[in-house]
Amino acid sequence: MSRSEALFAQAQKHIPGGVNSPVRAFKSVGGTPLFFKHAEGAYVVDEDDKRYVDYVGSWGPMILGHGHPDVLDSVRRQLEHGLSYGAPTAMETEMADLVCSIVPSMEMVRMVSSGTEATMSAIRLARGYTGRDAIIKFEGCYHGHSDSLLVKAGSGLLTQGVPSSAGVPADFAKHTLTLPFNDIAAVEKTLAEVGQTVACIIVEPVAGNMNCVPPAPGFLEGLREQCDKHGVVLIFDEVMTGFRVSLGGAQGHYGIKPDLSTFGKIVGGGMPVGCFGGKREIMGCIAPLGPVYQAGTLSGNPLAMAAGLTTLKLISRPGFHAELTDYTSRMLDGLQQRADAAGVPFVTTQAGAMFGLYFSGADDIVTFEDVMASDAERFKRFFHLMLDGGVYLAPSAFEAGFTSIAHGDKELQITLDAAEKAFAALK
């Protein structure tokens, strides 16, 4: 029995399913989840001392690679001054100033402790600002696990094979309208009918929770136009895409300014952090300035601010994101070449330093239906074959992959060598 198998058996005694987030259980790919004990650079090391090139990156935050010395040093320095104060700190203001200088649409920002908390708070704020109740989201897009958002969600819920979650009251769900991703005509039709009741549209500008589906040409532009027309708040959920697709996030890359944005993952440098922000007029409705209440004991935690500030400063250097995107493109080109050579139907998607892998004969992946038509069973086999070759992919056919600046030519070769063997075995 491996150490991971023994630890998983032990974990199931007191942790539901043996994990603290469902996708980690390997339910969609089969087998025993790996338990990791160390991570450094582009690698993770499991409890049996096997090293893997890591394309999960803690589900996105580790854009610098694991254990970047500058980030670790900043956290160590803060440790000497205490873990949490429950009071304002200078670092919170520095973080707010930096985020607002980087992200095109941000005029004010509020720190929270997770991406779920950020999206939940942004929606509450949009409702308070507009005085409307309904929200629009898109099929297969995941915005955290708050009740009103677990309606035809993506990510872990796709992995489980269910469209929603038990325990969500019908009264919550009735205010959530779900439309097809990348279908602006559906948005136009819905807003023409009920636009006066809709507080906000929330969207992943790149859908990263049904693997990785970039926006179709004109989709984000159409959302901006329709929200302006109907007085609807446009929220970009940039928890995944923020600071990764480009320094300014997806909104910086695609040139579309939302009214509100939510962030997580990279903004905390690996610590539990989220934030939301946007137009000053809307943010002025949040307490203590306005009537929309939001609070958090650990919001703006000094350890998290130290890690996040250091990370954002490091990734702001000229050329950083061009290097990341280039590595990602070279890796995906190499995978496609090897799949084609093996005669395996395979297509990749990319948005900067995030990517999707699909076993599909489609020319491109644009819709939720395209995602669901891909061969998840073949992905299961591929996942385990890549593990055997020393490459750790997300343990789900519906999760995006992530690269880091620590990935280089050596890691690329390991990845492509493993993939060549895997594709040959999948014929």
Curated annotation (Swiss-Prot):
Reactions this protein catalyses: (S)-4-amino-5-oxopentanoate = 5-aminolevulinate
Compartment(s): Cytoplasm
Pathway: Porphyrin-containing compound metabolism; protoporphyrin-IX biosynthesis; 5-aminolevulinate from L-glutamyl-tRNA(Glu): step 2/2
InterPro entries: 4pyrrol_synth_GluAld_NH2Trfase (IPR004639), Aminotrans_3 (IPR005814), Aminotrans_3_PPA_site (IPR049704), PyrdxlP-dep_Trfase (IPR015424), PyrdxlP-dep_Trfase_major (IPR015421), PyrdxlP-dep_Trfase_small (IPR015422)
Keyword hit for NADP: no
Matches recorded under SUPFAM superfamilies: PLP-dependent transferases
Record-listed N6-(pyridoxal phosphate)lysine modification sites: K265
Cellular component, GO annotation: cytoplasm
UniProtKB keywords: Cytoplasm, Isomerase, Porphyrin biosynthesis, Pyridoxal phosphate
Highest taxon listed in the record's lineage: Bacteria
GO molecular function: glutamate-1-semialdehyde 2,1-aminomutase activity; pyridoxal phosphate binding; transaminase activity
Cofactors, names only: pyridoxal 5'-phosphate
UniProt GO BP: protoporphyrinogen IX biosynthetic process
HAMAP family: HemL_aminotrans_3
The protein's assembly and partners: Homodimer.
Family listed: Belongs to the class-III pyridoxal-phosphate-dependent aminotransferase family. HemL subfamily.
Entries under PANTHER family matching the protein: GLUTAMATE-1-SEMIALDEHYDE 2,1-AMINOMUTASE, GLUTAMATE-1-SEMIALDEHYDE 2,1-AMINOMUTASE 1, CHLOROPLASTIC-RELATED
Protein name (database record): Glutamate-1-semialdehyde 2,1-aminomutase
Organism name: Pseudomonas putida (strain ATCC 47054 / DSM 6125 / CFBP 8728 / NCIMB 11950 / KT2440)
UniProt gene name: hemL
